[in-house]
């Protein structure tokens, strides 16, 4: 009964309201027009040059950001043109577990990767730039951290790369040995800037000095 009364009361009150409103003069509506907004005049500002807008460079040809080989150095036989694009599969195959690496790269929103290799003064220098879409998180930072984690497991010394925040260079004090092959000493550097992760490796039959790996890493980061 109480529930029925409440419903009836609402209906009755609504009907009474309609009857009262019907006997009144209509209320005029406010004007629909809005004040005219002033429009901007003149030409739109010119886009910033690459020197002021980093995205102008990083959204262009990624190969143009690679460090050029020094005078007197030669590109390896399998890289005559000096530069190679790497698709997702090719990058994954550079890891010891390609299947797992492939899934990680998909998760990290891999966009593209490019590399260059040259031989100079008895050493082989390899530089790789990997770019991520970064729509979800800073994948370039994650990739650099992971690479540094692997490098820190090897015996050697390491130093921060100036101007990179947490970028680091590593020199291995013990050579990598494999039956049937010449022992190889390795130095590497890993850093990131924006949506690009940088990896550098320098290998050779003789120990790689700190100055060598730091010079390559710093000059490459300057181009980013």
Where are these regions (language model features)?
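Hydrophobic, Leu/Ile/Phe/Ala-enriched alpha-helical segments that form helix-helix packing faces
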Residues: 117-118, 145-152, 220-224
């Amino acid at each position: 009964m109480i529930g029925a009364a409440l419903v009836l009361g609402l209906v009755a009150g609504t009907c009474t309201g309609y009857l009262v409103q019907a006997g009144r003069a209509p209320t005029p509506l406010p004007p629909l027009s809005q004040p005219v907004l002033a429009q901007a005049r003149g030409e739109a500002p010119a886009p910033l040059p690459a020197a002021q807008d980093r995205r102008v460079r990083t959204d262009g040809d990624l190969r143009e950001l690679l460090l050029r080989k020094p005078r007197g150095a030669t590109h390896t036989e399998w890289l005559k043109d000096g530069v190679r694009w790497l698709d997702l599969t090719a990058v994954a195959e550079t890891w010891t577990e390609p299947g797992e690496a492939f899934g990680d790269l998909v998760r990290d929103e891999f966009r593209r990767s490019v590399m260059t290799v040259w031989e100079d003064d008895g050493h082989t220098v390899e530089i790789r730039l990997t770019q991520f879409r970064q729509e979800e998180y800073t994948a370039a930072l994650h990739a650099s951290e992971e690479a540094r984690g692997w490098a820190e497991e090897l015996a050697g010394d390491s130093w921060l790369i100036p101007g990179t925040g947490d970028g680091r260079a590593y020199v291995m004090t013990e050579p990598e040995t494999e039956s049937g092959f010449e022992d190889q000493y390795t130095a590497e550097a890993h850093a990131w800037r924006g949506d690009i992760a940088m990896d550098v490796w320098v290998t050779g039959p003789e120990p790689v000095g700190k100055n060598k790996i730091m010079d390559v890493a710093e000059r490459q980061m300057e181009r980013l």
